[in-house]
Amino acid sequence: MAKHDTPLLDELEKGPWPSFVSDIKRQAEKNPDCWDILGQVELSYKDKITHWKHGGIVGVFGYGGGIVGRYSDVPKQFPGVEHFHTVRVNQPASKYYSTENLRALMALWDKHGSGMTNMHGSTGDIILLGCRTEALEPFFWDLTHDLKQDLGGSGSNLRTPANCLGQSRCEWSCYDTEEACHHLTMHYQDEIHRPAFPYKFKFKFSGCANDCVAALARSDFAVIGTWRDNIRIDQASVKEYVAGNIASNGGAHAGGDWGAFDIQAEVIDLCPTDCMWMEGDELKIDDSECTRCMHCINVMPRALRPGADQGASICMGAKAPILDGAQFATLIIPFIKVSADNEFENVIDVIENVWDWWMEVGKNRERVGETMQRVGLPTFIKVMGLEPIPQMVKEPRSNPYVFWADEEVPGGFERDVDEFRKRHAA
């Protein structure tokens, strides 16, 4: 039976849509503390202000991250959520679980916590909502010793790396995202669990430009699969698509009256760089102009495939609004080989290069993208030891002045004044 009146929350149960309110009420029948979370959220809706205290450091021994402190500022009114800490558990690569593992994890959370979960957080972790301070250490012991699972990242550290399904299920993946994600997760355990950065830092691994983990928009360091040779074309299948014998988009739009497939309107005219055209019944591509956006491949997957020389692009600096607003990542390295054969050493070298610089010059609570913005891209790529490329140009220059670095000027900027006066006597 409900412990609190929640008329505002009850409105969220109306209609045909899933409702977190209904979910919490169902869980409250098993764990009465959940009635208090509904009561506090109702009060927050009524007062139009959160009733979680700001901050609060709590954790498990030896770890600086993985637990997000939550304390109620009205504990006498809602004692069940006086402590209601969030636990982040590192998800397996690509979020593959056995039902046995999920049942064991849920049983553990019912034992030590509220039983409420969020599968998954936007970074990727398994989010376990609601644990009292005194239950954290017993939960952590059982999680690590019985289930052999670990906490994820929180705070100013490396957040839990995340990846798409990669080559386990997707034929477009240009590198093994699961192996890369798992290897770097294990390689950087200290950085995940012991905050040492100016602010959070996120890796995300997408196998192709479809970017199913939104790495370009949500990660400080995005590794996005690509290729550097030509798109592979099966001209016979192109003819079949044009004739309507193969459904476009892998049949994803079946059931609607979309009319006959129009390769000109649906593929060629939508190419962002206009690098495609038809010659008779053959599709032609100027691969030197192709941006590897994946659109044509998505529409005609049986006719087009990524090139055979595969790797990844590295983009850096994406973030949600913090100081300077949301921003997409900037392309830093157009192509790099990503392989477990060398234990991803070339990727690790780039990561540690930027960390060394960012930890030195980054301000407190400043994402690496904001540091890049503050110092300017020319300074950043110089620090990274890279040459500028056209993709780094945001807009055409708007002033007539050209800055020359000292080393770019023959003889530098230093001049002998006495020698100058001899040659230019008054």
Question: Which role fits each region the language model picked out?
Answer:
Residues 2, 10, 23, 27, ...:
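Small-residue-enriched alpha-helical segments and adjacent helix-cap loops
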Residues 110, 114, 144-148, 189, ...:
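Generic secondary-structure signature for well-ordered alpha-helical cores
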Residues 319-362:
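A hydrophobic, small-residue-rich beta->alpha segment in the mid-to-C-terminal subdomain
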Residues 114-121, 153-155, 194-200, 278-279, ...:
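Flexible, glycine/charged-enriched surface loops at secondary-structure junctions
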Residues 220, 263-285, 289-315:
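Iron-sulfur cluster-binding cysteine motifs and their immediate structural context
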Residues 1-73:
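Charge-rich, low-complexity segments
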Residues 161-164, 201-210, 368-381, 401:
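A glycine-rich phosphate-binding loop feature that marks nucleotide/adenosyl-phosphate handling sites
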Residues 379-426:
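C-terminal, charged low-complexity interaction regions
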